[in-house]
């Protein structure tokens, strides 16, 4: 009786979407995500930030290398078909 039901939440969400629009909400979500990421980076010590950046660079390099390796395979399959 005293709680908020799913229908009430849906009605509030619908009103918010109608008032602000999806583009405004999307940009607001992106800004909020950036703020949270910045806060997390500010809370970690400087040494950990450097190691996290190195890990991200390694993951990015590995991902791009895997994508480059997969690309010739798909091209050869396309040529065979």
Swiss-Prot record:
Q: How does it sit in the membrane?
A: Single-pass membrane protein
The molecular function terms in GO held by this entry are:
protein transmembrane transporter activity
Compartments, record wording:
Cell inner membrane
* Any one GO CC term of the record: TAT protein transport complex
Which regions span the lipid bilayer? 1-21
- Would you kindly state one Gene Ontology biological process term found in this protein's UniProt entry? protein transport by the Tat complex
**Which InterPro entries does this chain map to?**
TatA/B/E, TatA/E
Which keywords does the record carry? Cell inner membrane, Cell membrane, Membrane, Protein transport, Translocation, Transmembrane, Transmembrane helix, Transport
Skewed-composition ranges (Basic and acidic residues) = 47-59, 70-81
Classify the source by domain of life.
Bacteria
How does this polypeptide assemble, per the annotation? The Tat system comprises two distinct complexes: a TatABC complex, containing multiple copies of TatA, TatB and TatC subunits, and a separate TatA complex, containing only TatA subunits. Substrates initially bind to the TatABC complex, which probably triggers association of the separate TatA complex to form the active translocon.
The record's similarity note reads: Belongs to the TatA/E family.
Query: What role does it play?
Result: Part of the twin-arginine translocation (Tat) system that transports large folded proteins containing a characteristic twin-arginine motif in their signal peptide across membranes. TatA could form the protein-conducting channel of the Tat system.
- Put simply, this protein is called Sec-independent protein translocase protein TatA
- State the organism named in the record: Shewanella frigidimarina (strain NCIMB 400)
């Amino acid at each position: 009786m005293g709680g908020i039901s799913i229908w009430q939440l849906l009605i509030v969400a619908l009103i918010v979407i109608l008032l602000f629009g999806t583009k405004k909400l999307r940009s607001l979500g992106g800004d909020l995500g950036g703020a949270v990421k910045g806060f997390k980076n500010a809370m970690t010590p400087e040494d950990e930030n450097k190691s996290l950046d190195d890990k991200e660079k390694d993951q990015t390099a590995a991902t791009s290398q895997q994508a480059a390796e997969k690309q010739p395979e798909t091209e050869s399959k396309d040529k065979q078909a």
